[in-house]
Regions:
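Intrinsic disorder at enzyme termini
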Residues: 1-32
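Glycine-rich flavin
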Residues: 42, 49-137
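A ubiquitous short alpha-helical element
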Residues: 5-7, 32-38, 102-104
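Mature N-terminal segment immediately following signal peptide/propeptide cleavage
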Residues: 27-45, 51
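Alpha-helix capping/hinge segments and adjacent helical runs
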Residues: 2-10, 39, 46, 74, ...
Length: 137
């Protein structure tokens, strides 16, 4: 018999009775999740924030450089399976990257567009030829 679970949406865990084992808190993060969060925070602090004003003034050559650096760190490949040279991380790690990237001003949109509009549809819906062509680094 197939079991179904109710999805906890938004802040529902605050106002509804929820099994505590279904709520994830920072104390539950694995060492790998903490590491990717720290890597992203350091990247944003050291690479993005120093040029955020330049980006806001449409000096987009910085965006290209920053995306290349993010790619070298694996920050563009969290949801890409290892088979295609990605990190194949879990959704919590992917969410942590997005959270830490959110302080990066407009660059967080550049990053989000690349991973959310660019790569993720290919991961989820692309055929083998498309994945092999577009997903490798």
């Amino acid at each position: 018999m197939e079991q179904t679970q109710t999805i906890i949406k938004g802040g529902a865990f605050l106002v509804e009775d929820v099994d505590i084992n279904r709520v994830i808190t920072p104390e539950d993060f694995t060492d790998e999740q903490k590491m990717i969060a720290n890597t992203t925070s350091e990247y944003v602090q050291n690479e993005v924030l120093p040029v955020v004003e330049n980006l806001e003034h449409h000096e987009f050559e910085h965006s290209v450089r920053l995306l290349k650096t993010a790619g070298e760190l694996g920050l563009l490949a969290a949801d890409v399976p290892e088979k295609y040279e990605g990190l194949g991380l879990d959704k919590i790690s992917s969410a942590l990257i997005a959270e830490k990237m959110s302080v990066a001003g407009g660059f967080s949109i550049t990053h989000g567009a690349h991973v959310g509009i660019g790569s993720l549809p290919i991961v989820l819906f692309g055929n083998e030829a498309q994945r092999s062509h577009y997903l490798p680094k």
